[in-house]
Amino acid sequence: MAIVFPFQLEKKLISITSDRDQISMSIPEVSSHDSCLNDCHSVNSEEQAKPVCCLELNAHKDGIKVVDTSNDASTFSNSPLVPDNFGVVYPGIIYRSACPRASNFNFLESLHIRTIISLRQEEYSEEDLHYFTKHHINYYHIAMPGSKHRKNDCISSSSNPDISDVDDLVRKTLQLLLNKENWPVLLHCSRGKHRTGIVIGCLRALMNWPVGNRLQEYISFSHPKEREVDEEYIQNFSSDPSLKSSLNDLKRYISDSSSELADVVLSSESPTVQAATVNETCRSPGS
């Protein structure tokens, strides 16, 4: 029998149903006239809360990995509130997704997103940029080239100008993600698969995740269109001292936080987190 845990993201009530190693996250449906910031009532039926994804929580000594393992991937992406391919990198700190639409902005507001980092080539519309300004959201546009046309045999070559450019953009993005002044932050590209997957894979490398776990997470968001060139980049990513020093704030928050990050029994040998070890409250830094 499944166990239901209320999972509070600020004022947005999300119920999580656990069945062994998987959890299904349900978000109360909100009409176009309702605000995601309003207090939500308890979920009492399937009509009141439609599951939008199935998640698998994997733990490592440095954090939690949340992976969409839905049998029907469209269930998650069709939610009117949640951006496509949405994922939690570190609760209350770093999130990932495909490019959010205007219909997703209320959900992002409920997470108290302070910064949005876009890796797309395309710019947001003037209307969207005005929304960011109005709601005091920092916005960074890092036009990272896609990996679709790059050759596998040159992905690790520092002499290749395309790869050198990607290296520089990845490091700039990681610096923004690790800057606590930007938290909570949403990272996205067009579909939240490849460019976003590369950056998050490199972040996991900084946090000493095993290569296999990094690749598993990348594939879970990009399947069935995972790219060997991306996987090779994640495998071969090498850090530098400036990035290592920027990890201190993130590691400090993870170790000191009273949110679920501090309450999960973390073990790299047993990566699955049992639902009973997850604290009910996920808060933003400083809340």
Curated annotation (Swiss-Prot):
GO terms for molecular function: exopolyphosphatase activity; inorganic diphosphate phosphatase activity; inositol diphosphate tetrakisphosphate diphosphatase activity; inositol-1,5-bisdiphosphate-2,3,4,6-tetrakisphosphate 1-diphosphatase activity; inositol-1,5-bisdiphosphate-2,3,4,6-tetrakisphosphate 5-diphosphatase activity; inositol-1-diphosphate-2,3,4,5,6-pentakisphosphate diphosphatase activity; inositol-5-diphosphate-1,2,3,4,6-pentakisphosphate diphosphatase activity; phosphatase activity. It is found in: Cytoplasm; Nucleus. Residues 85-256 form the Tyrosine-protein phosphatase domain. PANTHER family: INOSITOL PHOSPHATASE SIW14 (PTHR31126:SF48), TYROSINE-PROTEIN PHOSPHATASE (PTHR31126). One of its GO terms (biological process) is diphosphoinositol polyphosphate metabolic process. The active site is at residue 189. Disulfide bonds: none annotated. Activity is inhibited by the reaction product inorganic phosphate and by sulfate (a phosphate mimetic). Not inhibited by magnesium. It is an enzyme of class 3 (hydrolase). Cleaves the beta-phosphate at the 1- and 5-position of soluble inositol pyrophosphates. Has exopolyphosphatase activity in vitro but does not appear to contribute to the homeostasis of cellular polyphosphate. The modification Phosphoserine is found at residues 156, 159. The keyword Signal does not apply. The keyword Lipoprotein does not apply. Belongs to the protein-tyrosine phosphatase family. Atypical dual-specificity phosphatase Siw14-like subfamily. It holds the Pfam family Y_phosphatase2. Keywords: Cytoplasm, Hydrolase, Nucleus, Phosphoprotein. It catalyses: 5-diphospho-1D-myo-inositol 1,2,3,4,6-pentakisphosphate + H2O = 1D-myo-inositol hexakisphosphate + phosphate + H(+); 1-diphospho-1D-myo-inositol 2,3,4,5,6-pentakisphosphate + H2O = 1D-myo-inositol hexakisphosphate + phosphate + H(+); 1,5-bis(diphospho)-1D-myo-inositol 2,3,4,6-tetrakisphosphate + H2O = 1-diphospho-1D-myo-inositol 2,3,4,5,6-pentakisphosphate + phosphate + 2 H(+). It comes from the Eukaryota. CDD domains: PFA-DSP_unk (cd18538). One of its GO terms (cellular component) is nucleus. This is Inositol diphosphatase siw14. Coiled coil: none annotated. The record marks 195 as: Transition state stabilizer. Optimum pH is 4.5 to 5. Its EC number is 3.6.1.52.
